[in-house]
């Protein structure tokens, strides 16, 4: 049984969408049980419509919900210990749940997750990993906005964590990893990126295969299983891809409404165009994973519908079932053990 704690008040639509999303996830995975955190008056009427879900869940009434516009520091001060967001994360810390899922304010969620769960040993900064649609299926891109900037060692840690996530999600034995750069040549790019490339080449890690530098146009090609970058560049790439998907959708809509014949053709092809737009948009592959914490936290897109919420829950389900954090901890331990200088008589 995989136990999932769910912030029912997160996102643009709160329990009206989050609860039906949980019901969809339960239909697909009967071995899920839920721990819900919400505001009773708003959640009870919706939950009553899903008796099967109510049976497989425990509901905790909370004092407040974090708004989508609150600053992380304000949310932490106001909502620590008593908000739906905090308590859903705390359930992972206490062992009541295996994974926490929220569609709430990203900054507040990261601040609370870091404060409540703390980072793993040898991890200076957590990262947000996005599942990215590609021509070959899906890949993982991290960091897409947890922190701005990263040194070579932090990029190295991101590579290890991303590789572990790829093994848990895609079930590949040795995922390929690339560093996002302005060119594939070794002499190009910022010093920290070049140094991270050197570290990855020399580390010879058996849990991943370093494929060198990749460029922005490789993101959609699926050139590698994992693309590593720092949060500023990663977030720009994510928002650019989301915007491009919407732009293409608008172009198609405009082109197909210019004449009566085009409008008739659009009606017949609408589902295909919608599928194209969704394929291009990383936000539709819902469920950003916070990596590097002592517990699994999944961030759903705030504007997700019930299907999107279900997808985020399923990402959390897969991560917990396939032992994501154990894989990360093992990989970090092996790598950092190699870096330690020899001790005892052998060192002399």
From Swiss-Prot:
Keywords: Cytoplasm, Lipid biosynthesis, Lipid metabolism, Phospholipid biosynthesis, Phospholipid metabolism, Transferase. It is found in: Cytoplasm. InterPro entries: FA_synthesis (IPR003664), Phospholipid_synth_PlsX-like (IPR012281). Transmembrane segments: none annotated. It holds the Pfam family FA_synthesis. It is an enzyme of class 2 (transferase). GO terms for biological process: fatty acid biosynthetic process; phospholipid biosynthetic process. The keyword Metal-binding does not apply. Its main location: cytoplasm. One of its GO terms (molecular function) is phosphate:acyl-[acyl carrier protein] acyltransferase activity. One of its GO terms (cellular component) is cytoplasm. The keyword ATP-binding does not apply. Homodimer. Probably interacts with PlsY. NCBIfam families: plsX. This is Phosphate acyltransferase. It comes from Rhizobium leguminosarum bv. trifolii (strain WSM2304). The gene is plsX.
């Amino acid at each position: 049984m995989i136990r999932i704690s769910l912030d029912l008040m997160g996102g643009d639509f709160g329990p009206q969408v989050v609860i039906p999303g949980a019901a969809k996830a339960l239909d697909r995975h009967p071995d899920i049980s839920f721990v819900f955190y919400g505001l009773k008056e708003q959640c009870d009427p919706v939950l009553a419509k899903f008796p099967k879900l109510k049976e497989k869940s425990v509901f905790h009434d909370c004092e407040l919900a974090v708004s989508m516009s609150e600053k992380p520091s304000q949310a932490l001060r106001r909502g620590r210990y008593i908000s739906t967001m905090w308590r859903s994360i705390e359930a992972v810390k206490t062992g009541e749940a295996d994974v926490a899922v929220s569609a709430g304010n990203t900054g507040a969620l990261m601040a609370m997750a870091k404060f409540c769960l703390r980072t793993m040993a040898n991890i200076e900064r957590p990262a947000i990993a996005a599942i990215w649609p590609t021509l070959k299926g899906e890949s993982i891109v991290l960091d897409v906005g947890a922190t701005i900037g990263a040194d070579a060692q932090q990029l190295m840690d991101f590579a290890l964590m991303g590789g572990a996530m790829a093994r848990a999600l895609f079930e590949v034995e040795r995922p390929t990893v690339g560093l996002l750069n302005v060119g594939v040549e070794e002499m190009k790019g910022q010093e920290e990126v070049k140094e991270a490339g050197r570290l990855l080449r020399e580390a010879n890690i058996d849990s991943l295969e370093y494929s060198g530098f990749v460029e922005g146009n490789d993101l959609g090609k699926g050139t590698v299983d994992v693309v590593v970058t720092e949060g500023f560049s990663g977030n720009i790439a994510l928002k650019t891809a989301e915007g491009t998907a919407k732009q293409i959708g608008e172009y198609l809509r405009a082109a197909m409404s210019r004449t009566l014949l085009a409008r008739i053709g659009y009606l017949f092809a609408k589902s295909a165009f919608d599928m194209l737009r969704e394929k291009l948009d990383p936000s539709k592959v819902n469920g950003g994973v916070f990596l590097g914490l002592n517990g699994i936290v999944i961030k759903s897109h705030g504007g997700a519908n019930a299907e999107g919420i279900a997808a985020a829950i399923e990402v959390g389900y897969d991560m917990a079932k396939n032992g994501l954090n154990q894989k990360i901890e093992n990989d970090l331990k092996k790598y950092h053990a190699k870096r330690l200088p020899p001790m005892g008589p052998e060192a002399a």
